[in-house]
């Protein structure tokens, strides 16, 4: 400061400078903090989930380890994999890496026989429940394929009857069945006694047009997908409607029809298999926010995105590409198993940049 200023004047000037600086910092700091918070959101929660191809198994045929129209894939507590085939009317059991172990089932209506086996549910005691669609029943087996019991008293709409059921899920909140032909969801207790039901045919929040895909999150909320209406409806475990999300289209977060299957992982991420015209698996949070997808497109008409492994001849779908995918399941490590029905195979994908699903 200039030497001719008095001590009092110097103090006044210093006080003015410090006060001005303090006010400036007060005005600027919130904007700095907001910028940091936004950056954290952009690089963290909003990052898209990504998966890498791991392995595949299966081919077209009727022998062990082969499929014609594979439909569902499920796991028991030891990691064994079970696949239903709705054309061969059987269930096949594999190791977690895809090595064939055994198969059971044949066409018919007797115990242990199937007419279009659809979904597979496995309870906490490793009992296998198969939705036997055209026999309008659910059959129960042990892990060796030995028949134990069945539920369903013929085709109908009474409480002890089913009409072309298509999905089943076990949860701490109950056992839920998509009774597709009756346009309703059934809830059973652990003894398979009916405790609740909801839905009727029609368009609306509490009505269904052939509900055929269901799963349950950690809070007991039930997610329902329909054959002829795009999007997902969400209910509490007692059937109270909560919300719906999704619309028709081919963009991220949109669906083509039919939506084939719904699966919820241990982090409450919702995986939805899109329709045959847009074959992919999309991933959402519980509010319908798009998080990522699995599956790369192949346009057979132009060859864009397809492979030609043997020179002249038909184009093929490579690893990570699907033809008419039908079901998806997530194991305890977060690996995603996709039933690639049109290619008669199972494809497995591992999480890359994602949080652990444990």
Where are these regions (language model features)?
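N-terminal Sec-pathway targeting helices
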Residues: 3-19
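Bacterial N-terminal signal peptides
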Residues: 17-27
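Intrinsic-disorder-associated interaction segments
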Residues: 4-8, 25, 46
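Eukaryotic scaffold repeat domains enriched in small/polar residues
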Residues: 30-358
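Short, aromatic- and cysteine-enriched interfacial helices/patches
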Residues: 2-5, 33-35
């Amino acid at each position: 400061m200039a030497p001719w200023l008095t001590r009092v004047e110097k103090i006044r000037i210093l006080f003015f400078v410090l006060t001005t600086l303090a006010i400036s910092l007060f005005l600027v700091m919130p904007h700095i903090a907001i910028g940091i918070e936004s950056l954290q959101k952009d690089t963290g929660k909003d990052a898209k989930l990504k998966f890498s191809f791991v392995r595949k198994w299966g081919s077209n045929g009727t022998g062990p380890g082969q499929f014609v129209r594979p439909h569902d894939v499920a796991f028991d507590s030891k990691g064994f994999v079970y696949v239903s085939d709705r054309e061969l009317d059987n269930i096949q059991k594999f190791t977690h890496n895809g090595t064939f172990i055994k198969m059971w089932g044949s066409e018919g209506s007797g115990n242990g026989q199937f007419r279009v086996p659809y979904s597979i549910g496995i309870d906490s005691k490793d009992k296998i429940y198969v939705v036997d669609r055209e026999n309008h029943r659910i059959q129960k087996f042990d892990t060796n394929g030995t028949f134990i019991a069945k539920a369903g008293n013929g085709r109908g709409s009474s409480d002890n009857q089913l009409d072309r059921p298509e999905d089943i899920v076990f949860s701490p909140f109950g056992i839920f069945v998509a009774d597709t032909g009756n346009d309703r969801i059934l809830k059973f207790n652990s003894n398979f006694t009916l405790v609740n039901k909801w839905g009727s045919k029609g368009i609306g929040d509490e009505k269904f047009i052939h509900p055929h895909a269901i799963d349950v999150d950690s809070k007991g909320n039930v997610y329902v997908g329909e054959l002829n209406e795009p999007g997902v409806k969400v209910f509490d475990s007692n059937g109270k409607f909560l919300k719906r999300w999704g619309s028709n289209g081919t963009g991220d977060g949109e669906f083509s029809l039919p939506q084939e299957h719904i699966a919820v992982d241990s982090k409450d991420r919702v995986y939805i298999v899109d329709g045959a015209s847009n074959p992919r698996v999309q991933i959402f949070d519980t509010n319908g926010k798009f998080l990522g997808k699995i599956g790369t497109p192949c346009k057979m008409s132009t060859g864009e995105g397809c492979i030609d492994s043997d020179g002249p001849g038909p184009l093929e779908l490579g690893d990570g590409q699907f033809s008419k995918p039908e079901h998806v399941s997530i194991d305890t490590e977060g690996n995603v198993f996709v039933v690639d029905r049109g290619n008669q195979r199972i494809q497995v994908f591992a999480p890359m940049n994602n949080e652990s699903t444990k």
